[in-house]
Amino acid sequence: MSPTRDELLCTALDFVAQFAKLDPESVLSFLSPSCTLRSFPSSLGKPPLQTKEESKADFQGLKDFFHNFQLRVKDGAEPVVDEPARKVVLHIEGKGDSLVGRFETEYIYILQMNEEGTMVEDFFQFADSATRDAWGKKIEAHFSAKN
C-alpha cells in the first residue's frame, strides 16, 4: 500500500526537524542507503549530486559552525504533497547563529520518499544564492583573519 499524504508529510517534517539539530547521524538516519542529495543553484559550488556517505562531512561541518540553528516551514507556505510520486515540496526558513554572526535564509526542499514513505530517497535543495554569497564572504573574511 502506498503511503498517504499525511505519512509523507510527517516523514518530511520529521526529516526537517532532525536536520535542524545538525546531528549528522540523526539526519543520515532519515536517508535511504541509496539516497542522493542535490544542491542548487550550481553557482554555490556544491557537487551536483552526492551520495548519503559523501554528504556526511557536509552535515558535520554545519554542526561545527552553527548553534541555535532552526529550520521550519515558512509561514503561509503550504507544503505540496504528490502522493503517487511520493514527493513533498517545502518552503523552508533557516535561522541560526554562527561563527560569523546571525544567519537567515530560505530553501526549497523537494523530498522523494521510499515506497513505504518512511525514508528520503532523493533530497533536492535549492538555496537562496544571494544570502549564501553574502554569507560566504563573511566566512572567507573570518578564516582569512585567523590565518
Curated annotation (Swiss-Prot):
Xref: SUPFAM superfamilies: NTF2-like
Pathway(s) per entry: Secondary metabolite biosynthesis; terpenoid biosynthesis
GO biological process terms held by the UniProt record: terpenoid biosynthetic process
Domain of life of the native organism: Eukaryota
Reported function: Part of the gene cluster B that mediates the biosynthesis of the fungal meroterpenoid acetoxydehydroaustin. The first step of the pathway is the synthesis of 3,5-dimethylorsellinic acid by the polyketide synthase ausA. 3,5-dimethylorsellinic acid is then prenylated by the polyprenyl transferase ausN. Further epoxidation by the FAD-dependent monooxygenase ausM and cyclization by the probable terpene cyclase ausL lead to the formation of protoaustinoid A.
Subunit and partners: Homodimer.
Matches recorded under PANTHER family: AUSTINOID BIOSYNTHESIS CLUSTERS PROTEIN F-RELATED (PTHR39598:SF1), AUSTINOL SYNTHESIS PROTEIN F-RELATED (PTHR39598)
Other remarks in the entry: In A.calidoustus, the austinoid gene cluster lies on a contiguous DNA region, while clusters from E.nidulans and P.brasilianum are split in their respective genomes. Genetic rearrangements provoked variability among the clusters and E.nidulans produces the least number of austionoid derivatives with the end products austinol and dehydroaustinol, while P.brasilianum can produce until acetoxydehydroaustin, and A.calidoustus produces the highest number of identified derivatives.
Family, per entry: Belongs to the trt14 isomerase family.
Protein name: Austinoid biosynthesis clusters protein H
Organism encoding this protein: Penicillium brasilianum
Lineage of source species: Eukaryota, Fungi, Dikarya, Ascomycota, Pezizomycotina
